[in-house]
Structure formats: C-alpha cells, structure tokens
Amino acid sequence: MSPVLEDVVELDKTAEQVVASMLAAEIAEKIFYTDERVGKVYPNLISPNAFDKKLVAIAVLGYPERVGVWSYTLLRQSRLSESSMEPYFREFARHEFGLVAIDPNFFDPDIEGDSFIYQLERVVADIAHDKKIGFIGFSLGGRILVEFLERSPLILGRAAGLVLIDPVLRNELKLGNIRRLLDNDTLLIASQDEGHSPGEIASVLLQIPRVSFPGLHGEMPNKAIEEIINFYEKRIP
C-alpha cells in the first residue's frame, strides 16, 4: 500500500471512531440507503428525529473526508476536536434543528461529485414538503451545493438558507436560478490565511459579502458554528 493511500485509510478509521463515539452518546444515528448505481448500501449520519424538525439541514463535507470529521488536514495534526462534526450534532439538536451529514466518499473518494449529488437527491426526497431545508457546504461541498441548487429550481423554494464554508468554486459559474438565494439567504464563511482564501475568492465570484475568521481552511467549520446557528435561527419562526 502506498504511503498516501495508507494515510487516508488511517484517517478514515479515525473518522469512523468519531462516528462510533457519537452513536454511543446517542447524539447521532445512522440512516442507510442503497446506491442503486452499484447495488451497495451506504450510511448517512443524522441527528435523532432529524426529519421531524421544522428545519432539516444537510451538511456536505469536502474531499476526501469521510462523514464524522471536516478536515483530514487537522487530523494529521492531531487536532481531532477541531475537526469533529460532533459539535454540530449537539448544537443543532439543542436548537431543535435536524441535521443530516451525507457520506459521499464512503465507497471511494469522489472528486468529481457524482456521489455528492446522488446522496443529496436521496436525502432531499426524504424530507417532507412542509419542512424547510438548510444547506451547509464546506470546501468542495460548497461547490457541489452551488451547482446542485442552480440546476434544481424546484428545491430552491424549500431552502431556508445556504451556508458556504470556505467553498472551493469553479471560475465559470451559472448563478441565474440561485441569485436571489445568494443575495438574501446565504452565509459565506471565509478563512483569513496567507494569500487569497477560497472563501475570499468565492465572495468575488458570487458577488456576496463574507464573514471572515482567522485561521486555516480546515478550521473554519469549527470556528463558524455559532454564526451558522444564528443564521438559521433568524430564518425559522
């Protein structure tokens, strides 16, 4: 096994240990779907009774991370608490919000985004039409959400808001359908590190303001959680 692949395998194991801890603490549960493209079962992670809440937020992480952690870069630095998704599950439950974290890299790391879109569509289909949907995308997950929502205008009417955490976007973007969502109901988080961060570049590409935090790319989900909770609290009566 190559050193790079061995590294990712070990990081995957750490992510699985984080999930196991969350399951044992009963702050998260697994929900299983079948990927009809390959005939295999995969899990998503949900907060208890997530689909019964007035707001159901879908968290989309980056590449090649597995559900349970936001950043393998931080894991390599033994910064597990800053990378863990556990605070999100605790805070969303405390505020009576549902949270679903998809796991698009479950079978293999997916840099193209096909499994991201597939899993997003499955979760959205499971959310009742009287519920509002929140979208949270970090890194590649932010790009996936921008492109997914742009080509899914029927879903836009159900969106309570879009949170983009240091999203890594393409330079060429179509934004016609989501322009109103971007202007009125989008929270953009940007890292402040050396050079131009993904969030700073996204602010220019999307033509929307940003909320900046000092620190590295992988630190942003942990640093932004209070801002994100406040953002959704303002959008759900």
Give a label for each model feature.
Residues E147-R151:
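Active-site signature of alpha/beta-hydrolase-fold catalytic machinery across serine-
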Residues K54-A57, K132-G134, G161:
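Structural motif
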Residues F135-V146:
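Gly/Ala-rich beta-loop-alpha elbow adjacent to hydrolase catalytic centers
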Residues P153-P237:
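The feature captures the conserved acid-bearing segment of alpha/beta-hydrolase catalytic domains
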Residues T34-P104:
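Short, surface-exposed "cap/lid" segments of acyl-processing enzymes
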Residues Y63-E65, F106-F107, L140, V168-R170:
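Conserved beta-strand elements of beta-rich interaction domains across eukaryotes
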